[in-house]
Design a protein with these regions (language model features):
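Terminal targeting signals and extreme-terminal segments of soluble enzymes
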Residues: 1-85
């Protein structure tokens, strides 16, 4: 049983990344199931912290991207909007 309010496709989710931070950081949505969404983000020089590993802020952006998109897919977006904090 799907948790999504409507039937969404992975192609639709991918189209949501245009011209925003997700695109800038290279976040790619790779899989969409009935109750989950999967994305990946490359670790680049500009997303590493001083010790060479992924910066925590970049990790938060990835989590925010997944959470916000999934939240909006669970509601009637004509009546409500879900945003992150």
């Amino acid at each position: 049983m799907s948790i999504w309010h409507e039937k969404f496709t992975l192609e639709h989710v991918i189209s949501l990344r245009n011209n925003n931070l997700n695109k800038h950081l290279g976040i790619e949505f790779t899989e969409l199931g009935e109750d989950y969404i999967v994305a990946r983000m490359p670790v680049e020089d500009f997303t590493r912290q001083s010790r060479g590993i992924l910066h925590g802020g970049a990790s938060c952006v990835l989590a925010e991207a997944l959470g916000s998109i999934a939240s909006n897919m669970c509601i009637d977006m004509r009546k409500q909007k879900a945003v992150g904090l």
